[in-house]
C-alpha cells in the first residue's frame, strides 16, 4: 500500500498545467505535433468531444468530426501527452450523457448539439 502515494507523486510531475477545462459535448481544437522525416509540424484536429476516460497521466479523450464527403473521423488523444501542443475550447455543448456514441449513427442536422450558456 505504500506504493500508491509514491506513484501518485511521480505522476504529478508529468501532468500538464495548460489544459483548459472542457467536458463531453464541447467542441475543441487539438494541436498535434506531427513528425515527417526530419521535419516537425503542427496539425489541428477540430471536433466534438464524445468521451473522456481515466484520470491523472492516463486521462484520454476522443474527438469526432465529419470529414469530406460526410465520413466521420474519430481520434483518441492522451491529454497529458508531449505530442499534444495544445487544446483550445471552441464551443461549449449542452448534453446529458457521459458518452456521445449515438452521434456515430447520425449525420447532418441530427448530429447537432445545443450550446451551453453561461
Swiss-Prot record:
GO terms for molecular function: structural constituent of ribosome. Pfam families: Ribosomal_L19. The keyword RNA-binding does not apply. It comes from the Bacteria. One of its GO terms (cellular component) is cytosolic large ribosomal subunit. Keywords: Ribonucleoprotein, Ribosomal protein. One of its GO terms (biological process) is translation. Transmembrane segments: none annotated. Gene3D superfamilies: 2.30.30.790. Belongs to the bacterial ribosomal protein bL19 family. PANTHER family: LARGE RIBOSOMAL SUBUNIT PROTEIN BL19M (PTHR15680:SF9), RIBOSOMAL PROTEIN L19 (PTHR15680). This protein is located at the 30S-50S ribosomal subunit interface and may play a role in the structure and function of the aminoacyl-tRNA binding site. This is Large ribosomal subunit protein bL19. It comes from Herpetosiphon aurantiacus (strain ATCC 23779 / DSM 785 / 114-95). The lineage of its organism: Bacteria, Bacillati, Chloroflexota, Chloroflexia, Herpetosiphonales.
Amino acid at each position: 500500500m505504500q506504493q500508491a502515494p509514491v506513484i501518485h507523486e511521480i505522476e504529478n510531475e508529468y501532468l500538464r498545467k495548460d489544459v483548459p477545462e472542457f467536458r463531453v459535448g464541447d467542441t475543441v481544437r487539438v494541436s498535434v505535433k506531427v513528425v515527417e522525416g526530419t521535419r516537425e509540424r503542427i496539425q489541428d484536429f477540430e471536433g466534438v468531444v464524445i468521451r473522456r476516460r481515466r484520470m491523472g497521466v492516463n486521462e484520454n479523450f476522443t474527438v469526432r468530426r465529419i470529414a469530406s464527403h460526410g465520413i466521420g473521423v474519430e481520434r483518441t488523444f492522451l491529454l497529458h501527452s508531449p505530442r499534444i501542443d495544445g487544446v483550445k475550447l471552441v464551443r461549449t455543448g449542452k448534453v446529458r450523457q457521459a458518452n456521445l456514441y449515438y452521434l456515430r449513427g447520425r449525420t447532418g442536422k441530427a448530429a447537432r448539439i445545443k450550446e451551453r450558456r453561461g
